[in-house]
Regions:
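Extracellular beta-sheet-rich ligand-binding/adhesion modules
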Residues: 1-196
Length: 196
């Protein structure tokens, strides 16, 4: 068990045994990857998080080093993730399903949904100050992008990923396909109903 946050800054790190992490992070803007030995289980502890992020022009490769499946296990519902701009293969998620944003499916994955902002189904909260849910100025089709997109609906996933940490007050009845909070340090206040 690694109880302190672990930020992997080296090139193509490999994790060769089953581990439990409080916080595991691998981010990059250049060509890079993180690899795990097949058959291992990487558990994200209660209240912990895993962050795997590449860039639009350089997806972070997340894969088994042995062309067989490894598992990312979430200990409970309080374990969280922020995963985007990755290419994943031979990964099984357990305990929670993963929404990999702007990412590609390299095959042999389970429990992972790959979504692209270009599909029009994702809405990112981008407000930097306290404001309300029901304003299009607070929503973007890309993480940290320009506001003015439609407010999330039953066909949209509302994503709070830390690229807008302003507090959000749900000021009108809302229904969304999914609600994802990962890396967000603000507060969502429910002043009206929300259906997920």
């Amino acid at each position: 068990t690694i109880s302190a946050p672990l930020n992997l800054t080296g090139t193509t790190p490999r994790i060769t045994s089953s581990m439990t992490f409080s916080d595991l992070t691998k981010t990059t803007t250049t060509a890079d990857g993180i690899f795990f030995t097949a058959g291992t289980t990487q558990t994200i502890a209660s209240g912990g998080s895993i962050t795997l992020y590449g860039a639009a022009s350089n997806l972070l490769s997340v894969s088994s080093s042995d062309s067989a499946v490894f598992t990312i296990n979430f200990a409970d519902a309080t374990a969280s993730y922020a995963i985007g701009y990755v290419s994943m293969s031979y990964v099984t998620a357990s305990g929670q399903n993963i929404l990999a944003i702007n990412s590609t499916d390299g095959g042999n994955n389970g429990g992972i949904t790959f979504a692209s902002a270009t599909s029009g189904t994702l809405r990112y909260w981008i407000a930097t100050t306290s404001t309300t849910w029901n304003s299009t100025a607070n929503w973007s089709t890309t993480s940290g992008g320009a506001g003015g997109s439609s407010v999330p609906t039953t066909t949209s996933d509302a994503i709070f990923d830390g690229n807008g940490n302003g507090a959000c007050a749900i000021d009108a009845a809302a229904s969304v396909k999914g609600l994802y909070l990962a890396g967000y340090t603000g507060t969502v206040t429910q002043n009206s109903g929300i259906t997920v």
